[in-house]
From Swiss-Prot:
Residues 1033-1057, 1325-1340 have a biased composition (Gly residues). This is High affinity cGMP-specific 3',5'-cyclic phosphodiesterase 9A. Mg(2+) binds at D781. Pathway: Purine metabolism; 3',5'-cyclic GMP degradation; GMP from 3',5'-cyclic GMP: step 1/1. SMART domains: HDc (SM00471). It catalyses: 3',5'-cyclic GMP + H2O = GMP + H(+). InterPro entries: HD/PDEase_dom, PDEase, PDEase_catalytic_dom, PDEase_catalytic_dom_sf, PDEase_CS.
Length: 1526
């Protein structure tokens, strides 16, 4: 029960005093409290919404006992008249009742009692203590005299108040009704909130039923003017229907003479406290009655009451001398309606000084309360809930009166408050001693040990002035218990409110609940302004409450700033008690003149707002609370979801609070001067160091140790304090995401530190470079959101827009790093010269930007080129080495022991999967290597380590052999470990693939062996055509040359020509064959990541990767590495510079740059458009330039460009052309583009891929195709001229030996986003196997039209085989999965479907049958020549008679709509066609074959009927390699 802060019987005051008094008067006080509680309870129930009654009374006796006690008290009042006794009893009773009512509110009976008494309810528990003796036995006699006077005064006042109440009855009734309705509305909203939040622990004591009952009580109370009856009814209800006449009479008496009661109370001695409690109860009852009357009359007779208050104040002032002799602490809680009673209780409160304290406290409290109410306003105004505590009613006049009283009593109040606040704890513990102490500072101060129940209603000051302030929120927060009387401010963090709230009663009622709700929603860590937000009722009672609150909270600004809220509830209680006395006096005075404002809720609210503003800026504590509360609200997603806050949601990764940071800083500063042991420092130099064994503060300290150990602090005069502040700020600016958090930053820095020590980089590079490296490592992921650049670019986030899709995160990290350094206290480089700082800045930016994995191949290629001639005196070489070093440190987890590295892998996958989920939910292209449905931990690790990490480490090891044992060998061990795991999975997948090729083709694992992949047989019916490496004329050809081509070309191995030795491999390497052509293998980087522009090492670094598990090839979207996808993603964007001939070797426009040198990667420029950017259906700029120009080797390492050191290197750069990427990213968009009609031009590419008019001889095309397949194909990827093609029925084309050449259908530019990997299986097989029908690469009998599904599955198979694992998008769709191309049936839809299913033209493309002009063979050939309206650039499909082998030149690769996946752009590295070199082998030169689109049919972008089988004519081999010949 809120008896702690509330007034227990005077004897039950907080602290020892309360204990002692309680002990002495336990029974009596209990009874008194019960009676008072009963009375108060009924009023509280009614006023619950309006005021919060805080019951400090510990007595839980029934109201009947309280009544009896009250009667007894009256009788026992020493030397007190019956009236005085009644007054005293009333006060005690009121206090008790208030506490009891609060306590009892939970019970129906209590609620009833409180209903009646709430308005009247003022608990004035006075502890009469002599200043000298703890016990007021001697002072009780003095109290008797005072009580007599008080009784007389109270009687007179009561009569006046009754008259006033009669005048104001109607007005009050209406005001109450409005108030309750508003409160009910608020409460209903609160209940609604509680429904949404399971953790919303708002205990709403004001149920709808109770609110209705309260309303009825209000009506009844106003209809019945006899306060005695009302009080009696309340008591009866509280006491379980036990009627008590004595308390009622006492209440009447009290109402009659509230001032006398105050005097009597003040004169009471502690010995009489027990009796006083009873008397107080009686008085409280009387006061409550008077308050009711006054509440009725307050509005109209407010001014009148002021005069009465003045006399009362005079009486009180007169009383002070007795009060001096006997110190009595009385807490009066007055309900709005019971303003008169509150006034009475205030008057009854001991002395003028007390009254002053009360009034001062009240005014102060009201200000505080206003502030608290402001919280509600803030919450609900923002919520568009404009209730704004309208429930709060201030009686401005009463407050004014109270304020005046407070002013008059200010000095005393200040003293009382100070003493009380100081002595509250003591008083609570030792009421008598406290009373004495209090009395000493202020004779008039009653012993504050007594506890009182005060409602948080603003009450008029004794002087009649309005309460200038409401209770401070700080007061509430600081002292929960004490504030319970006032505000029942409870911190929800402890969920205390749950217990307390049921007992809260206040006129604000639901408004208090509002605050509770807001608090609770704000994580229950803020103050709970329980019901009484300094009730708007301007009642004297409210004033008393306000006085108490002000006393508790501290002196009112004007009254006494000295009065400060004590953290202890005891202090608050003591102050509250003193304030209560003053408040009682003030309330008596206020009741006389302040009733006028009673019904003016709007005015009260306005006043409240003004007060809030004033207090808000004057109360630091409250401001802090408000700020904290607002922060919690603003950062609470649920609050935002409810529109409770207009602040947009912050990133989910953002930290919402800093308490942890502060604690970490505190801990760090405590240990920062210590030194780690030698063992720790030695361990810090090893990769096995595990940061998760250390706390955050320790980790920061370890970072400091790195600077110390490397000597940077001394060498560069870095201030230690600045370094520490900088490290702490860096810590703060890392987000709590699974992987890219502060611990990751430490791991990278620690690995750099270990490498620096191991390789002696200080001597190799110099101190400054090492400093740059260490700082770069620490800052390299600052403020990382947990979503990588791929997401940023695809989602067009603020960072992507800000940095134009160019390494958005890395640029952001740099920006944050230097923003931190802008702060002098964090600028560790402050002592450097400007030139040196500029060099440092340049170096840090270079290093951080190098961590963008999209630049991996570019950087690695360049580094490998300079390694043989590395010169430590060459600035460019040093810069490149620094970039390699930070890249190694950044991805060095696998160099750590498995027990350290494995958890980091799990965290990384957690972050990846979260991003994948976000991409799916937002409709963005799903990054293949992050899709939990497509990747497995072993496979992902094998690909990453084998294709990305190990080559990088080994490249560094060649220059710095000291690192071989430190990091390279552990990485090899890790690779072997994951490879074994992956092999088992791969075998399983293969078996599954064999059983269901088409299904496996879609599967991410790439389990399908090229053998398993079945090219649709010429008989379209057969979905599968197992390709034997040697089958068909083409070595790779399976059932069709195309099949071979598919197997070989697509696989890259066993290219259709068989020229690729790997051709034989293709069957075994489902993905590897398709994903990594032997050619591509020749370049490790390319092999490493099919999608990533493989760095094509001049040599055959690829050889290292030949071993990769078959499933590990990066060709599939699932198998694409982060580098591949990142390159593709960024390259569209980065290539915004155009496919400008960045790479010297190849101009995107002229694919001439020898493809041979660089296997066509997705990176190869697909620019059929010569660097034109294709706009996605989204219209994104991402629209991946078909021409993504490769960044020339000579090009500086720009963020955009990945210049490769050679044309072949450009390969890796070639990725730049993520041609299909546009599709890749926005497959959907691409779809639309695919849908667009494309005038297919006959690309006049030398590549067989180039479609020629039907007039072209197939032989020519075949020859070209073969040449291209051989890699001879135009090394210069010529762009096919875009020629609108009309495809005459081309049955004859089907005859062409190459199925690929098979008459090209007009490609609706629905070019299936053929992965570059999608080399049209049609790639012309040398022996154009079965050119007729299935001949050639198509592997599909041209004419046979299989069911659309069969040809679709074939396309899938082909795409899987041919699509390089990079064809993420294809993969995504299953590489064969239909690429997003909507229109294309199967193959057309899928770029991946390399013309699979071409053989099937359901439309009746019979072999040799004329192709329906309407049909478009969407071939994805990259042939740039073909113009794609939409995105598809040129693939023209040669529809063979019957065998529609698709051959689109490479341009189409862009058109692949694979775009859903971020996977490698449609072009496989190997498919030069993807790279926009149509000629590239990728295009399967089949275009050269019948591919020459027969002009004549104008292709309209239309979805190819499923019957159309499109053959992707993508040469499997990278252009650099001879494409497999069909």
């Amino acid at each position: 029960m809120y008896q702690d802060s509330g007034c227990s019987s005077s004897s039950s005051r907080r602290g020892s005093s309360s204990a002692a008094a309680a002990t002495s008067t336990a029974a009596t006080a209990a009874e008194t409290a019960a009676a008072a509680a009963a009375t108060t309870t009924s009023s509280s129930d009614e006023e619950t919404l309006e005021t919060l009654t805080i019951i400090t009374t510990t007595i839980t006796d029934s109201d009947i006992h309280a009544t009896t006690t009250t009667t007894t008290v009256i009788a026992s009042g020493t030397a007190t008249t019956a009236a005085a006794a009644a007054t005293t009893a009333t006060l005690a009773t009121l206090a008790t009742l208030a506490s009891n009512s609060d306590i009892e509110d939970s019970s129906p009976v209590e609620s009833e009692d409180s209903e009646e008494c709430e308005y009247i309810e003022i608990d004035c528990q006075t502890t009469a203590q002599e200043g000298t003796s703890p016990s007021g036995g001697s002072s009780s006699s003095g109290n008797a005299v005072l009580l007599q006077r008080s009784s007389n005064n109270l009687q007179q006042q009561q009569q006046q108040q009754q008259q006033q109440q009669q005048h104001l009855q109607l007005q009050l009734q209406q005001a109450d009704e409005r108030l309750l309705r508003k409160i009910g509305y608020i409460a209903s909203r609160v209940r609604c909130l509680s429904k949404y939040y399971g953790d919303f622990r708002l205990v709403n004591p004001y149920s709808a039923r109770r609110q209705r009952r309260q309303l009825q009580e209000i009506l009844l109370r106003h209809s019945i003017f006899d306060p005695g009856k009302e009080h009696q009814r309340a008591i009866v209800l509280a006491a379980a229907t036990a009627a008590i006449a004595g308390p009622l009479a006492a209440i009447d008496c009290v109402c009659g003479s509230s001032s006398i009661s105050l005097e009597a109370v003040s004169s009471r001695s502690r010995s009489s406290e027990l009796e006083d409690d009873h008397h107080e109860q009686d008085q409280v009852q009387e006061e409550q009655e008077q308050e009711q009357h006054q509440g009725d009359t307050e509005d109209n007779e407010e001014e009148q009451e002021h005069p009465s208050e003045k006399p009362e104040r005079t009486d009180i002032e007169e009383e002070p001398p007795p009060a001096i002799a006997v110190t009595t602490t009385t807490t009066a809680t007055v309900r709005r309606k019971s303003s008169s009673s509150s006034t009475i209780s205030g008057t009854a409160t001991v002395s003028g000084s007390v009254s002053v304290s009360a009034s001062a406290s009240q005014s102060f409290c009201s200000n505080n309360i206003n502030l608290l109410e402001e919280l509600l306003i803030q919450f609900y105004e923002e919520q568009d809930h404009r209730s704004n505590l309208t429930v709060i009613r201030h009686h401005h006049h009463q407050q004014h009166q109270q304020h005046q009283q407070q002013q008059r009593i200010t000095n005393n109040n200040n003293n009382n408050n100070n003493c009380n606040s100081i002595q509250n704890n003591n008083n609570m513990s030792n009421p008598a001693a406290t009373a004495a102490a209090t009395a000493t500072p202020s004779v008039e101060q009653p012993a504050t040990s007594g506890t009182t129940n005060i409602h948080l209603q603003p009450t008029s000051l004794p002087d009649g002035s309005d309460n200038p302030r409401r209770r401070r929120a700080s007061d509430c927060s600081a002292v929960q218990a004490a504030l319970q009387n006032q505000l029942h401010c409870i911190t929800l963090k402890n969920n205390n409110c749950g217990k307390a709230m049921p007992f809260h009663r206040g006129s604000c009622g639901a408004a208090g609940e509002h605050l509770l709700a807001a608090n609770s929603i704000a994580n229950r860590a803020t103050i709970i302004l329980s019901k009484s937000c300094s009730n708007v009722d301007g009642d004297a009672t409210a004033t008393a409450a306000t006085a108490l609150s002000s006393t508790v909270g501290g002196g009112i600004g004007g009254i006494g700033g000295s009065i400060k809220m004590r953290a202890s509830a005891t202090d608050i209680e003591t102050n509250a008690l003193n304030g209560a006395r003053d408040a009682i006096v003030a309330s008596n005075n206020g009741n006389n003149g302040n009733n006028g404002n009673n019904g003016n809720n709007e005015y009260s609210i306005l006043q409240l707002n003004n007060t809030i503003i004033q207090c808000h800026f004057n109360d630091d504590d409250f401001r802090a609370l408000v700020k904290d509360l607002k922060r919690k609200v603003e950062y609470t997603e649920r609050m935002n979801w409810l529109c409770l806050s207009k602040r947009p949601l912050g990133p989910p990764h953002r930290k919402s609070s800093l308490p942890k940071h502060q604690e970490v800083k505190r801990r760090f500063l405590e240990i920062c001067d210590t030194t780690f042991s030698e063992e720790v420092r030695a361990a810090l130099r090893l990769p096995a160091f595990d940061s998760y064994e250390w706390s955050d503060a320790d980790v920061i300290h370890l970072m400091q140790t790195m600077f110390v150990e490397l000597g940077f602090i001394e060498k560069f005069s870095i201030p230690v304090d600045t370094l520490r502040e900088w490290l702490y700020e860096v810590y703060k600016h890392y987000n709590e995401v699974p992987f890219h958090n502060f611990r990751h930053c430490f791991c990278v820095a620690q690995m750099m530190y270990a490498i620096t020590r191991q390789a002696n980089l200080l001597s190799r590079l110099g101190d400054l470079e090492c400093l740059i490296l260490l700082v770069s490592c620490i800052c390299h992921d600052l403020d990382h959101p947990g979503y990588n650049n791929i997401y940023q670019i695809n989602a067009r986030t603020e960072l992507a827009l800000r940095y134009n899709d160019i390494s958005p995160l890395e640029n952001h990290h740099c920006s944050i790093a230097f923003r931190l350094l802008e702060h002098p206290e964090c600028n560790i480089f402050k002592n450097f010269s400007r030139d040196t700082f500029n060099n440092i800045r340049e170096g840090i930016i270079r290093c951080i930007l190098a961590t963008d994995m999209a630049r991996h191949n570019e950087i690695l290629t360049q580094f490998m080129e300079i390694t043989p001639i590395f010169d430590y005196s060459n600035r460019a070489h040093i810069n490149l080495l620094c970039m390699i070093l930070i890249k190694v440190a950044d991805i060095s987890n696998e160099a750590r022991p498995m027990d350290v590295a494995e958890p980091w892998l799990d965290r990384l996958l957690q972050e990846f999967f979260a991003q994948s989920a976000a991409e799916k939910s937002e409709g963005l292209p799903v990054t293949p290597f992050m899709d939990p449905d497509k990747v497995s931990k072993p496979g992902s690790q094998v690909r990453f380590i084998g294709l990305v990490l190990l080559p990088l480490f080994e490249a560094l090891g060649e220059l710095v052999p000291e690192l071989t044992e430190l990091i390279i060998i552990p990485v090899r061990i890790a690779l072997e470990y994951y490879r074994r795991l992956n092999d088992a999975q791969t075998k399983t997948r293969k078996s599954v693939a064999d059983s269901n090729t088409s299904a496996t083709s879609d599967s991410n694992s790439g389990t399908i062996d090229s053998n398993a992949a079945m090219v649709s047989t010429p008989g379209g019916a057969s979905d599968k055509l197992s390709l034997d490496k040697g089958q068909g004329n083409s070595q790779g050809s399976g059932g069709g040359g195309g099949g071979g081509g598919g197997g070989g070309a697509g696989g890259g191995t066993g290219s259709g020509c068989g020229s690729n030795a790997a051709g034989s491999v293709s069957p075994q390497m489902p993905r590897s064959g398709s994903g990594i052509s032997v050619k591509s293998r020749r370049s490790i980087p390319s092999q490493k990541s099919a999608s990533r522009t493989s760095v094509d090492e001049p040599g055959g670094m690829a050889s290292e990767l030949h071993d990769l598990p078959e499933g590990s090839e990066s060709g599939d979207s699932e198998t694409a590495t982060e580098v591949d996808v990142a390159e593709k993603t960024s390259k569209f964007k980065v290539d915004t510079e155009g496919s400008s001939n960045r790479s010297k070797s190849s101009h995107s426009t002229s694919r001439k740059s020898s493809r041979e040198k660089r296997p066509s990667m997705i990176g190869e420029l697909c620019s059929s458009g010569g660097g034109q950017r294709i706009r996605n259906s989204y219209g994104n700029i991402h629209g991946y330039h078909s021409n993504r120009c490769h960044f020339g080797n000579n090009r500086a390492v720009s963020l955009d460009q990945y210049s490769s050191a050679g044309n072949n290197r450009r390969l890796s750069d070639g990725l730049p052309q993520v041609i299909s990427d546009s599709n890749v990213f926005y497959g959907r968009h691409n779809r639309s583009s695919t849908e667009t009609t494309v005038a297919v031009g006959n690309p006049q590419d030398t590549n067989a891929n180039t479609n020629h008019p039907v007039g072209c001889q197939l032989k020519e095309l075949l020859a070209r195709t073969e040449a291209d397949s051989d890699g001879e194909g135009d090394g210069n990827g010529r762009e096919d001229k875009k020629i609108p093609l009309v495809i005459p029925s081309m049955p004859q084309l089907a005859t062409s030996s190459n199925g690929n050449i098979s008459p090209t259908l007009v490609v609706t530019e629905q070019i299936l986003p053929s992965n570059g990997s999608t080399r049209s299986s049609a790639s012309s097989g040398r022996g154009g196997s079965g050119v007729p029908g299935g001949s050639g690469g198509s592997g599909m009998p041209g004419p046979s039209a299989g069911s659309g599904s069969s040809w679709k599955s074939r396309l899938r198979q082909f795409s899987d085989y041919f699509s390089f694992s990079f064809d993420k998008s294809n993969k995504r769709f299953g590489s064969t999965r239909s690429s997003p191309c909507p229109g294309s049936n199967s193959s057309s839809g899928r770029t991946n479907n390399n013309a699979n299913g071409l053989g099937e033209n359901q439309d009746g493309l019979g072999a040799g049958g004329g192709i329906k002009p309407g049909m478009c063979c969407t071939t994805i050939t990259n042939s740039s020549g073909s113009t794609v309206k939409g995105e598809t650039r040129g693939g023209t499909a040669g529809a063979g008679g019957g065998a529609l082998t698709t051959m689109t030149t490479g341009n189409d690769a862009h058109q692949r709509h694979r775009a859903y996946s971020l996977d490698v752009p449609g072009m496989m590295r190997y498919s030069s066609n993807d790279s926009s070199r149509h000629p590239s082998n990728n295009t399967l030169q089949s275009a050269g074959g019948g591919a020459g689109l027969t002009t004549g049919l104008e292709v309209t972008a239309q979805r190819v009927p499923p019957s159309l089988s499109v053959e992707m004519g993508l040469a499997s081999g990278s252009s650099s390699e001879a494409g497999p010949k069909i």
